[in-house]
Amino acid sequence: MITLHNGNETIELLTDDNSYSYEAVMGEDTLTLYFSHPGYLNVPVGSWCEFYGKRYSLKKDSNFKKNGERNYSYTLVLETSKADTELWKIRNTVDNRIKFPYTAKPKEHLKLIVDNLNRRSSGWVIGECIEGTEKLINYNHTVCLDALSQLAETYEIEYQITETVIEGVHTKTVHLKKV
């Protein structure tokens, strides 16, 4: 049983055994839910659930199929906050430019990315980070997820985004380390 939340409303779902979660290093982190319902069920974008300590949100409309008069089959693909990193561009924190060169150590590059993520939402923090020399990365209309990939490639390392929900506080930690 999965409980979806949307504002003050909750929806209890009895999911099929085919439902699954998928997480890849430097890749997607999704929760796919399959379920049936005797009537149409409105599951609005923004609905969320907690699953094994992570918060998954519905970022796109649900997919449903009508099988007769009283049977709807639903597929919901919920994503972690990592999906939001594909929406927002990196800006220079000094003058707001979106095209700029930046020479810094790994932790400073990571701080730039986390600062940009916190401009749009809250709860993003820096986690473990490698030590390294200063290197130049050119940001040119770069979204945050691509900036993380570029940073990992520059230092030949991996990034990881972990999420925790403790007593209602949602924290998203960005690590730059060997995963």
Labelled PLM ranges:
Residues 1-99, 149-158, 179:
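Assembly/oligomerization scaffold segments
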Residues 79-179:
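Charged- and aromatic-enriched interaction segments used to assemble
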